[in-house]
Amino acid sequence: GADGAHSWVRRHFKMGRPKELMIGFQVEVTGYQGEDGRLDMYTGSRISPGFFAWAIPSGETTRIGTWSKPDLMGGESCEQLLDRLREDPLWAERFSECREVGRFCGPIPSGMVKRPMIARVALFGDAAGLCKPTTGGGIGPGFAQVDLVTPLLLDALEKDNLSDSSMREITGLMEPMRKDQRRAKALRDAFLTESSDTELDEIFSVWARPEVTELINDIGEIEHPIPLGIKMLRDIPEFRSLTKRAVKAILLG
């Protein structure tokens, strides 16, 4: 089943649930007044509780969105949160000339399900809970899963051996992906989701320091955030207080 976040296949065969489910909302606009080629990120409990909002240049348009967990949103929708961002006096000028040309909304399942493969049944992509806990992206992990398991799956098909034990063996190839998700979520929680607005201000003030910015530029990679996160927890004194939030998941996966 590659049938999305609310996978019928996953539910029918009782293969488990993604560890967390976020909601994302994005509009595509013209007229956003940001720096050319630069991504803008916004944080705070009023606009994206526990997570962040974004404005990403995309050719002639800009993609503006926000995401969060339903239990952190206080009964509000992501659309309401995004409206609040665009109306905030701090940023309103950037959005004043925006004209909407498209909108998108949907669930973001993250945290691999307990049993992504059983006898003669396999889950892929969002159905398996493969979205990144740090960015919500799901295309990259989905393709990575396909590249990882396809050779053994094809071999199992040719041998007509899709038994539960055979599928468990193939699932074992995905355990590093599961551990990476746990570690990335632990870092996200430490730096973002479990931080108050005051703590976020302090974190961003540290990130803005030249030596920290240089560190981020040297080893930071959006597809692989774990090495940077661990190094910041280890080497930057101001971040050591965050270590206890993340250390168990980071070390043990």
Predicted regions and their residues:
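FAD/FMN-dependent oxidoreductases across multiple families
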Residues: 72-153, 157-158, 168-169
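Predominantly flavin-linked oxidoreductase catalytic cores and closely associated redox partners
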Residues: 1-95, 109-113, 129
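C-terminal helical "tail/cap" subdomain of flavin- and related membrane-associated enzymes
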Residues: 154-253
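Short acidic (Asp/Glu) and glycine-rich catalytic loops that position anionic groups and cofactors
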Residues: 60-62, 125, 183
